[in-house]
Amino acid sequence: MKRLLVLVLAVIMMASATLSAAPARIEPELSVITPVASFVSVAALDAFKVWAKEKYGVDVKTNYTAKGTQLAVGLIREWGANPQADIVWGGETVLYDMLAADGFLIKHEVPKQLLDRIPDTMGTPKPMPLKDPKGFWVGTALEPYGIVYNEGLVTRRLRATPPKTWEDMLANPKFKGQIAQCTPDNSSSNHATYEVILQKYGWEKGWEWLSKLAAYTGQFVARSVDVPGVVAKGEYALGFAVPSYMAFENFLNGADIRFIAPPGAYVTPEPIAIIKNCKNPNAAKAFIEFLLTDEGQRLFIERGLFPVVPELRVEGPPGSTAELAVTFYGGRRSYFEGTVENTYDNALSQSRESEVNKYFRENIFAKLDALKAKY
């Protein structure tokens, strides 16, 4: 009898150990709200489904809602205690800090071996966070906000030199009427670039520069994602843009466009966070884990984004999408090779978001005709 009891206890202990060693069960569904382009987000979700099946034995049904960052944040606030998505992904970290402070996100633990590969910050003289020290969000990939330009239009038709700095946009009168941009109150990415200028030059000189930029602007498009399209078609020579918001896709489709991130350009770590009271928190955690694996990071590399892990870089066989991305970016392969200038202050940007938008509407957008006459 004792021998039988010992045998039963041993079997129970072995079963318990097996269960504890097995991966935690995840929900069979995952919903994401994101400004990240479908070129990236759909591929990531499809790859995650394969990864989740192999690791957890679960067929995860995924869906995503494509929204600009500001619209996504607004929806999350509207949803309140009944969110219609599990994850918010992409955009500017300052908006994630605001959501966290207002109680719309939950802290989550990323596997230590993956989290430790990501540096706390990047850039000088103002270090830019790549992961939230409080644990509400973590960066997934690096993407600069900068200038997209039509190389043929700039060099052959206008006989101008492609821009390398912010100053170059306004230094050549040939660019007057050749710039496209979205207003900062309609685009969080454009708002971030406005803040880069304001923090670089100071409030008064920054607005003077932005006023001249408005005078040189041929069109204020409805969305930031529209800028690469009008530049690719040759309707305008250059404009503020985010690579994954159609710029790199247009390049892959044969458009004669290139991208430059001027010194001090904002670089988003494409943050990701779990929404409080979401329906599928374990699937959400698993998706974040997947994006930080080598497999997830390579997915970004193959779509023109930079890895958030220093030991990885954008490279691939000749003619690969990764190598085409290097051409598109003017030779850059990593944001961890060499010095990255950053003066963008998250706290300052957060504290005056409404003030910046109000100033733009009242002193620039409402006075466009006068500014065009002045400059």
What are the roles of these predicted feature ranges?
Residues V148-L153, T268-N282, L299-F300:
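A bilobed periplasmic-binding-protein/Venus flytrap-type ligand-binding module shared by bacterial periplasmic
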Residues M1-E29:
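Short, low-complexity disordered leader/linker segments with a strong preference
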